[in-house]
């Protein structure tokens, strides 16, 4: 009978070697990845604004890291580009030197994507094997890894949309590509933000309301970034270049907003509608940030109050840049100055997402 009551020896517990120093290393690594993703978004924006995104018409995840090296290779790459509608309809006068310029942007964009993959994957494996990852972090890192793999496929899915029947990529695919990059960026910051030293969060009252405001800030910031991708893909920023009115009115007529049939197509394909929604979402985001600022001043102290100020100031700067990008399209601001302005608008959008992510994390973990 005694034999029946004997249980096998328990397996030895997995030993973790997580220290404040190792957690700090993981934190710094994730902030580095976030910084590279930030740079990636800016390079991607420049690639789009210079009309370079369709210059490489094939997807070779491994061998594609090597650019054309000989005159023969360059001639072949240029010939491949000459077969797509963008070259035939928009740039039939482009010569080989012009092609090399746009090729460099797209190749650099793809090279940076590969670099980010390595910078994320190799340290992840090392931290994992040495049991240096804090408890609960592994599933989050695997999710970020999955998002990165998905992003690679979505990038080619986006490019392929502009190779046959269009002279540019599909705007909805561009917006999806951008929002996935934003989610990877925010996820790295979210996880890294939880690995620092814990400081007390002081909230006198209305904690639930403050949390709701922070969640709304996250949701509307991500929505606004997605809408920004649609605006970019449709070139909707080049129509109705006035503010605060659109053709003399604050709200355009329903006949213009819903000109396409069925009605929901306007949400993706009507430049006026997309620009109008982008404007209105900016106003909503401003009001949420202002409400959060007031509530934080009345009910919090320390980091939360400072965080609310930083979020509000970032959104103010972003609105100013958005208005400037919209209205400054004539000389002397067209061309390179306007490209720099648009890239600044895109960069600050990511900065807004970063500070909103940190503020939301503080509130939800308090």
Model-found features: residue ranges?
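Polytopic transmembrane helical bundles with strong interfacial aromatic enrichment
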Residues: 2-366
């Amino acid at each position: 009978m005694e034999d029946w009551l004997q249980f096998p020896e328990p397996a030895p517990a997995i030993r973790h070697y997580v220290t404040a120093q190792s957690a700090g290393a993981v934190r710094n690594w994730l902030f580095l990845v976030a910084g590279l993703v930030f740079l990636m978004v800016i390079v991607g924006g420049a690639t789009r604004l210079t009309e370079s995104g369709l210059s490489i018409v094939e997807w070779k995840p491994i061998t594609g890291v090597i650019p054309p090296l000989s005159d023969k290779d360059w001639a072949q790459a240029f010939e491949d580009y000459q077969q797509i509608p963008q070259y035939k309809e928009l740039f039939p006068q482009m010569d080989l030197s012009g092609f090399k310029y746009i090729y460099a942007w797209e190749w650099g964009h793809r090279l940076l994507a590969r670099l980010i993959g390595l910078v994320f994957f190799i340290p992840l494996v090392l931290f994992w094997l040495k049991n240096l990852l804090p408890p609960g972090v592994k599933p989050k890192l695997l999710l970020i890894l999955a998002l990165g793999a998905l992003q690679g496929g979505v990038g080619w899915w986006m490019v392929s949309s502009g190779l046959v029947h269009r002279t540019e990529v599909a705007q909805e695919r561009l917006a999806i590509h951008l929002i996935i990059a934003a989610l990877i960026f925010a996820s790295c910051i979210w996880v890294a933000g939880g690995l620092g030293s814990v400081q007390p969060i002081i909230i006198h009252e209305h904690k639930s309301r403050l949390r709701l405001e922070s969640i709304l800030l996250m949701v509307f910031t991500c929505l606004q970034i997605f809408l920004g991708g649609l605006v970019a893909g449709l070139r909707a920023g080049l129509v109705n270049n006035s503010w605060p009115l659109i053709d003399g009115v604050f709200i355009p007529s329903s006949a213009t907003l819903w000109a396409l049939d069925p009605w929901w197509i306007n949400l993706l394909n009507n430049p006026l509608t997309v620009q109008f929604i982008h404007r209105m979402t900016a106003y909503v985001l401003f009001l949420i940030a202002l409400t959060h600022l007031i509530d934080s001043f009345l009910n919090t102290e320390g980091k939360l109050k400072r965080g609310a100020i930083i979020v509000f100031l970032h959104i103010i700067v972003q609105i100013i840049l958005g208005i400037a990008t919209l209205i400054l399209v004539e000389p002397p601001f067209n061309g390179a100055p306007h490209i720099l302005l648009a890239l600044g608008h895109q960069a600050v959008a990511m900065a807004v997402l970063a500070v909103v992510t940190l503020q939301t994390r503080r509130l939800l973990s308090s």
